[in-house]
Amino acid sequence: MTPHTHVRGPGDILQLTMAFYGSRALISAVELDLFTLLAGKPLPLGELCERAGIHPRGARDFLDALVALGLLEREGEDTYRNSPAADRHLDRRKPGYVGGYARLADTKLFPVWARLTEALRTGEKQVPSQGGFFGGYADPEAARGFLGAMDAVNGGVGHSLAGALDWTEYSSFVDLGGARGNLAAHLHRAHPHLRATCFDLPEMEPFFQEHMKSLETTDQVRFAGGDFFTDPLPRADVFIVGHILHYFGLRQREALIARIHQALTPGGAVLVYDRMIDDDRRSAALSLLGSLNMLLTSDEGREYTPAECVRWLSDAGFTDVRTTAVSGPDTLAIGRKPR
C-alpha cells in the first residue's frame, strides 16, 4: 500500500481508489484456475481461453493485465506462462499455495469491507455474532476454505519461526490457536526432535486429523482441544501465538499472556507474531488496514505495536523480550520465562 507521503496529486488518489481492480483480477484468475492450468508449461491465448472458459472479448486485456501485475509472463504476442511467484504460490497443487486467501477475500472480505463506514459510525463489528467471520464449522467445505486461507496467511511465517530460536534447547512446543496444524507440522519437519501440539477449539479436531493425514504427519503432531481462557493449557517449553492476540481486547490479551507464562516450563519461550503496526503509526499501511479488518470482524480486536507487545510480555514476567520483522507484514516478539 502506498504511504501517504507518496500521494502527490489526483492521479495518485485515483490509483488508490481503483486499487481493488487488481485485487479483483487476481481473484477471478484464481476462480478460473488459471495459474494451475499454466503450471509447468505456457499456453497460447486460444487454448488457454478454451480450457479456462474465458470469453474472447475480455481475454487479452485480462491476461495482459495479469502480465502488468507481475502474475503472468507473455511470450511473443499471445503465449502466456506463470510468473515465478505465481507458479510457486498460485498453483493449487503446490505446498506454497496462497490462493485460498483470494477466495476468502471474494466471499467474506469484500462484503464485510463494504460496511466499513457503518463500523466507523457505530464501533461495532459487521459479522454475525453466531459463527463469526466465516460462519462456524457447520459447513465443512466452507470451513476447509477458511482454514486453507489461514494456512496461506501463516504459511510464510513457518520458515522464520524455524530459525527464530536455538531449538536444540527445547523439547516441546504448543501452537496456540493452531487450527488444522499446518504451521506446527512445518516446524516439526524442520526440527523433528520437538514434541508438537496444536491447541484449538474441539470443533477443529476433525479438520486437524484430515490435514495431518494429507501431510503424512498424523503421528508427529497431536491435537489438544479447549478454550484459551477457561481450559488448562498444555505444558510446553515454547508457546507460539500467531494472529491470536489481535482478535481480543486488552484485558483478554493480558489474561492469555499470563496463562501462557504459567503453562511454560522455566526457561521456556513465547513467540508472538501478528501484523503489528509500526511504533510511529505512520508507515505500516497494511497493518493499519488490518486493524480496521479486526474492527469489522471482532468484538474488541485491533492490531498493535511492537512496543505494546513488549510491554505486555514484560508485565507478565517475561524477560529478554525482543522483536524482529518476519515474513510479509508480520512482526515477531520473543520473550523468555526465567529459570
From Swiss-Prot:
One GO MF term attached to the UniProt entry: protein dimerization activity
Keyword Ubl conjugation belongs to the record: no
Protein name: Tetracenomycin polyketide synthesis 8-O-methyl transferase TcmO
Disulfide bond sites: none
Entry's family note: Belongs to the class I-like SAM-binding methyltransferase superfamily. Cation-independent O-methyltransferase family.
InterPro entries assigned: COMT-like, O_MeTrfase_dom, Plant_O-MeTrfase_dimerisation, SAM-dependent_MTases_sf, WH-like_DNA-bd_sf, WH_DNA-bd_sf
EC top class named in words: transferase
Keyword field contains Transferase: yes
GO biological process: antibiotic biosynthetic process; methylation
Organism of provenance: Streptomyces glaucescens
